[in-house]
């Protein structure tokens, strides 16, 4: 099993558990160049809020779109957008990525901006 298949397996297991809880989830995805975050409804059919370093507003705030500072900006933006829509509590879905570096920075930034998880 290669590295990507292992990550997807971990992500599937976590998503199954979150679905059992019936919680709205904050999903994180990262590539070497960008960081993406979405708040998805409990049934998985609706994206409530989203933010990424691909967006012009966030891209202009940071020098590099693939680092910890960019992840912090994305976390803050997605939390603010979720709170505007009335979502204050989420389950954190790290998509099988290790809770370290950019993933952890995004989570901490979202917590500081007011999301609870």
UniProtKB/Swiss-Prot annotation:
GO terms for cellular component: cytosolic large ribosomal subunit. The keyword Repeat does not apply. One of its GO terms (molecular function) is 5S rRNA binding. The keyword Metal-binding does not apply. CDD domains: Ribosomal_L18_L5e. Keywords: Ribonucleoprotein, Ribosomal protein, RNA-binding, rRNA-binding. Disulfide bonds: none annotated. Pfam families: Ribosomal_L18p. Transmembrane segments: none annotated. One of its GO terms (biological process) is translation. InterPro entries: Ribosomal_uL18_bac-type, Ribosomal_uL18_bac/euk. This is one of the proteins that bind and probably mediate the attachment of the 5S RNA into the large ribosomal subunit, where it forms part of the central protuberance. Part of the 50S ribosomal subunit; part of the 5S rRNA/L5/L18/L25 subcomplex. Contacts the 5S and 23S rRNAs. PANTHER family: 39S RIBOSOMAL PROTEIN L18, MITOCHONDRIAL, LARGE RIBOSOMAL SUBUNIT PROTEIN UL18M. Belongs to the universal ribosomal protein uL18 family. This is Large ribosomal subunit protein uL18. It comes from Vibrio atlanticus (strain LGP32) (Vibrio splendidus (strain Mel32)).
């Amino acid at each position: 099993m290669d590295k990507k298949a292992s990550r997807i397996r971990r992500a599937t297991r976590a998503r199954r558990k979150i679905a059992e809880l019936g919680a709205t989830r904050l999903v994180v995805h990262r590539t070497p160049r960008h960081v993406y975050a979405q708040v998805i409804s409990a049934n998985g059919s609706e994206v409530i809020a989203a933010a990424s370093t691909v967006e012009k507003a966030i891209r202009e705030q940071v020098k590099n779109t693939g680092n910890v500072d960019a992840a912090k900006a994305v976390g803050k933006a997605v939390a603010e957008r979720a709170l505007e829509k009335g979502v204050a509590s989420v389950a954190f879905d790290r998509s099988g990525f290790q809770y370290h570096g950019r993933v952890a920075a995004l989570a901490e930034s979202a917590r500081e901006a007011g999301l609870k998880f």
